[in-house]
Regions:
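A generic, residue-level signal for flexible/boundary positions that often mark functional hotspots
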Residues: 19, 95-97, 138
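Solvent-exposed, charged interface segments at domain starts and junctions
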Residues: 1-4, 60-63, 133-136
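Acidic-basic catalytic patches of nuclease active cores, encompassing PD-(D/E)XK
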Residues: 1-24
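Cysteine-cluster motifs in flexible loop/terminal segments that predominantly coordinate metals
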Residues: 120-146
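A generic structural signal for short, non-catalytic loop/turn and secondary-structure boundary residues
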Residues: 14, 76, 131-133
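Nucleic-acid nuclease catalytic cores
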Residues: 26-123, 142
Length: 146
């Protein structure tokens, strides 16, 4: 089973379900956590991520990172993803915006470039400075700005 990228009982159990929710993948081959969690995984190697905040470009890049990690684990191409934005307004039902994403070579390179920049900051112990614009929900906002 290990030759198919199934390195745990959880991986084997998850393959028995057609629509997999919260699939754990090993990102350590890419220098990431060994317990990455994608929100959902559909047959045909389609990654699905649910978001409740506003749409951001980095969401697509993160999806490419998940695809690379999954590919390194399974040796099966993962070229498609879906970002589903959930809006909870005053309306009686949530509004869903579904964004299909082609995970192409450019998006993969964008992820690798960002990963390499982050690793260089950590390895060189270089202070990246204060961001030009902070995300309103950043957990480090008080620490950086003071």
């Amino acid at each position: 089973l290990s030759r198919y990228g199934m390195n745990s009982k959880d991986s084997i159990a998850q393959l028995s379900v057609m629509y997999i929710v919260e699939r754990i993948i090993d990102g350590s081959r890419l220098g990431l956590s060994n317990r990455l969690m994608i929100d959902a995984f559909e047959p045909g190697n389609v990654l699905v991520e649910f978001k409740t905040g506003r749409e951001e470009d980095f969401h697509k890049i993160a999806l490419a990172g998940y695809a690379l990690a999954l590919e390194s684990e399974t040796n099966v191409p993962t070229d498609y993803g879906v970002l589903i934005y959930i809006r909870l307004n005053s309306e009686p039902y949530p509004k869903l915006n579904v964004r299909p994403i082609l995970i192409d070579e450019e998006l993969r390179r964008d992820f690798i470039d960002l990963r390499d920049q982050a690793m260089a900051i950590v390895l060189n112990e270089k202070d990246p400075g204060i961001a030009y614009k902070c995300h309103p929900q950043c957990p480090y906002k008080d620490y950086c700005i003071g």
